Amino acid sequence: MTKADLLFKDNITKIMSEGVFSEQARPRYKNGEMANSKYITGAFAEYDLSKGEFPITTLRPIPIKSAIKEIFWIYQDQTNDLAVLNDKYGVTYWNDWEVGHTGTIGQRYGAVVKKHNIISKLLKQLEDNPWNRRNVISLWDYEAFEETEGLLPCAFQTMFDVRRVNGELYLDATLTQRSNDMLVAHHINAMQYVALQMMIAKHFGWRVGKFFYFINNLHIYDNQFEQAQELLKRQPSECNPKLVLNVPDGTDFFDIKPDDFALVDYDPIKPQLRFDLAI
């Protein structure tokens, strides 16, 4: 059993046995009903990517190709334009969060990255002094929230640190998330930001180190309890999945493409489960 599978089962068990129910939830199911959830607070996980520990379960198939494309939309294209996400990457799931008829998700995510020139500043800081302790990406922008409507960012802060071990430099990353749908989005969000970590490490020719993941509110929606029990019954696959970035060390961050990533040794348990999402 991989570390990701062990943590997945532990978190599902903890939510179902110790979690409390939300009240006055904002999200709605497609039938208009309030989408409440059972949740725990303060969930934390640590993965040592350099030792082959990756945050992706084998208990069900996790579609990370589209998730990685979303990272490119946010941090390379640096836009909130849904047409870019739809036409360039073939990803449409953000369309449910379109603000009015603007064709955007409001001043969120990529728009905030562009507004503050976040990636270029981060890369410059790491180039000037890899050991500085100020390598922070924050998408929590109150001014932007007041400017337009839109879903507030869930994965809103990422921090990076560099370590020298036996003469090699390792890039560590910490992702902070205010809210996470355990069964649907947990491993998608984690692997997205592992991909971002790998892109930054490749830019400098460093190795990827540890990935730390903190979630304030980790939940299972009240229409997903049957799927939760099914996942607990499943025995994990014997595979040991790893994400690989197939570009030379020193490849510029903005020259990396989604197809440069490959998920290897991944043979998840099937069939896939169906989820009615809360919007």
UniProtKB/Swiss-Prot annotation:
<comment type="pathway">
    <text>Pyrimidine metabolism; dTTP biosynthesis.</text>
</comment>
<protein>
    <recommendedName>
        <fullName>Thymidylate synthase</fullName>
        <ecNumber>2.1.1.45</ecNumber>
    </recommendedName>
</protein>
<feature type="binding site">
    <location>
        <position position="278"/>
    </location>
    <ligand>
        <name>(6R)-5,10-methylene-5,6,7,8-tetrahydrofolate</name>
    </ligand>
</feature>
<feature type="binding site">
    <location>
        <begin position="133"/>
        <end position="134"/>
    </location>
    <ligand>
        <name>dUMP</name>
    </ligand>
</feature>
<dbReference type="InterPro" id="IPR023451">
    <property type="entry name" value="Thymidate_synth/dCMP_Mease_dom"/>
</dbReference>
<feature type="binding site" description="in other chain">
    <location>
        <begin position="178"/>
        <end position="181"/>
    </location>
    <ligand>
        <name>dUMP</name>
    </ligand>
</feature>
<dbReference type="GO" id="GO:0004799">
    <property type="term" value="F:thymidylate synthase activity"/>
</dbReference>
<keyword id="KW-0963">Cytoplasm</keyword>
<keyword id="KW-0808">Transferase</keyword>
<feature type="binding site" description="in other chain">
    <location>
        <begin position="219"/>
        <end position="221"/>
    </location>
    <ligand>
        <name>dUMP</name>
    </ligand>
</feature>
<feature type="active site" description="Nucleophile">
    <location>
        <position position="154"/>
    </location>
</feature>
<feature type="binding site">
    <location>
        <position position="181"/>
    </location>
    <ligand>
        <name>(6R)-5,10-methylene-5,6,7,8-tetrahydrofolate</name>
    </ligand>
</feature>
<keyword id="KW-0489">Methyltransferase</keyword>
<feature type="binding site" description="in other chain">
    <location>
        <position position="189"/>
    </location>
    <ligand>
        <name>dUMP</name>
    </ligand>
</feature>
<dbReference type="InterPro" id="IPR020940">
    <property type="entry name" value="Thymidylate_synthase_AS"/>
</dbReference>
<dbReference type="InterPro" id="IPR036926">
    <property type="entry name" value="Thymidate_synth/dCMP_Mease_sf"/>
</dbReference>
<dbReference type="GO" id="GO:0032259">
    <property type="term" value="P:methylation"/>
</dbReference>
<dbReference type="Pfam" id="PF00303">
    <property type="entry name" value="Thymidylat_synt"/>
</dbReference>
<keyword id="KW-0545">Nucleotide biosynthesis</keyword>
<comment type="function">
    <text>Catalyzes the reductive methylation of 2'-deoxyuridine-5'-monophosphate (dUMP) to 2'-deoxythymidine-5'-monophosphate (dTMP) while utilizing 5,10-methylenetetrahydrofolate (mTHF) as the methyl donor and reductant in the reaction, yielding dihydrofolate (DHF) as a by-product. This enzymatic reaction provides an intracellular de novo source of dTMP, an essential precursor for DNA biosynthesis.</text>
</comment>
<dbReference type="InterPro" id="IPR045097">
    <property type="entry name" value="Thymidate_synth/dCMP_Mease"/>
</dbReference>
<dbReference type="GO" id="GO:0006231">
    <property type="term" value="P:dTMP biosynthetic process"/>
</dbReference>
<dbReference type="GO" id="GO:0006235">
    <property type="term" value="P:dTTP biosynthetic process"/>
</dbReference>
<dbReference type="GO" id="GO:0005829">
    <property type="term" value="C:cytosol"/>
</dbReference>
<comment type="subunit">
    <text>Homodimer.</text>
</comment>
<comment type="similarity">
    <text>Belongs to the thymidylate synthase family. Bacterial-type ThyA subfamily.</text>
</comment>
<dbReference type="InterPro" id="IPR000398">
    <property type="entry name" value="Thymidylate_synthase"/>
</dbReference>
